[in-house]
C-alpha cells in the first residue's frame, strides 16, 4: 500500500463496514482519493451529520432525528398492533410491503449468549413495558385496558432470531398478551431485509 498514514487510516475505517475486507476497503479508498474527492468529502460530511443528529426513538427504539419517530407519531397507524423486529433495516423491509399499518419495536439486535448479548442489551424490558404497561401499583394493566392487543414477532428466521422470538413470546404470553409469529413462508435462516416483499407480505397475512 502507498506510504501514507492517512490512507491506511481511511482503509481501516472502511473495513468497519459489513462485508468489506482489506482488498475492498483499499479499492474504495483509492477510488475516492484518485477519482472522486468531492464525493469523499460529501460522504464524510453526511456521515458526521448522521452520527451527530440521529438518535433512538423514545417509543420504538428505531433510528430517527426526532424524539419520537414519524411512524410512532402518525395517528393513522393501528396502535393495537406492535411488530417486533431486529433492526431498522427489517422495519424498512416490512414498511415496503405496504401490508402492515401497526407500530414497531426495534430490538437493535438479537439474543446471542456466545457473543455476550443478553436481554438487557436488546431492550427486552422496554419492550415488555411498552406492550404491557403497569398501573400505579406496579401491576400489569388488564388486557382490555392496554393499547397494544397483539405483538407480532418478526425477528429473523435464524437460530438467534428464533431463540429471541421464543423468549419474548414466553414472557409476553405469561402477561396475557396475544403473540403471533410471521408465517413460515420466510425461508429458514434468512434475514428479512433480503427477502422479497411478496413473501414478507404473505408471512404477515398468514401469521399465527
UniProtKB/Swiss-Prot annotation:
GO molecular function, one term: DNA binding
Domain Toprim positions: 80-187
Keywords: DNA damage, DNA recombination, DNA repair, Metal-binding, Zinc, Zinc-finger
GO biological process: DNA recombination; DNA repair
Zinc finger (C4-type): 57-72
Recorded superkingdom: Bacteria
Family annotation (InterPro entries): DNA_Rcmb_RecR, Rcmb_RecR, Rcmb_RecR_Znf, TOPRIM_dom, TOPRIM_RecR
Gene3D superfamilies, sorted: 3.40.1360.10, 6.10.250.240, RecR Domain 1
HAMAP family: RecR
Main function: May play a role in DNA repair. It seems to be involved in an RecBC-independent recombinational process of DNA repair. It may act with RecF and RecO.
Homology family: Belongs to the RecR family.
Name recorded for this polypeptide: Recombination protein RecR
Organism listed in the record: Polaromonas naphthalenivorans (strain CJ2)
Higher taxonomy: Bacteria, Pseudomonadati, Pseudomonadota, Betaproteobacteria, Burkholderiales
Amino acid at each position: 500500500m502507498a506510504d501514507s498514514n492517512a490512507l491506511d487510516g481511511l482503509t481501516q475505517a472502511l473495513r468497519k463496514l459489513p462485508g468489506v475486507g482489506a482488498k475492498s476497503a483499499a479499492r474504495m479508498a483509492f477510488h475516492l482519493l484518485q477519482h472522486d474527492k468531492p464525493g469523499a468529502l460529501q460522504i464524510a460530511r453526511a456521515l458526521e451529520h448522521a452520527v451527530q443528529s440521529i438518535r433512538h426513538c423514545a417509543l420504538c427504539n428505531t433510528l430517527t432525528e426526532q424524539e419520537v419517530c414519524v411512524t410512532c407519531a402518525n395517528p393513522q397507524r393501528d396502535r393495537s398492533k406492535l411488530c417486533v423486529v431486529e433492526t431498522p433495516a427489517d422495519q424498512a423491509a416490512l414498511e415496503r410491503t405496504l401490508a402492515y399499518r401497526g407500530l414497531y419495536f426495534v430490538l437493535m439486535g438479537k439474543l446471542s449468549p456466545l457473543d455476550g448479548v443478553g436481554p438487557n442489551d436488546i431492550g427486552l424490558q422496554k419492550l415488555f413495558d411498552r406492550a404491557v404497561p403497569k398501573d400505579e401499583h406496579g401491576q400489569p394493566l388488564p388486557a382490555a385496558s392496554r393499547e397494544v392487543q397483539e405483538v407480532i414477532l418478526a425477528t429473523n428466521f435464524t437460530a438467534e432470531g428464533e431463540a429471541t422470538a421464543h423468549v419474548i413470546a414466553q414472557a409476553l404470553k405469561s402477561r396475557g398478551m396475544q403473540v403471533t409469529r410471521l408465517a413460515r413462508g420466510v425461508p429458514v435462516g434468512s434475514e428479512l431485509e433480503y427477502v422479497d416483499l411478496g413473501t414478507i407480505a404473505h408471512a404477515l397475512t398468514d401469521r399465527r
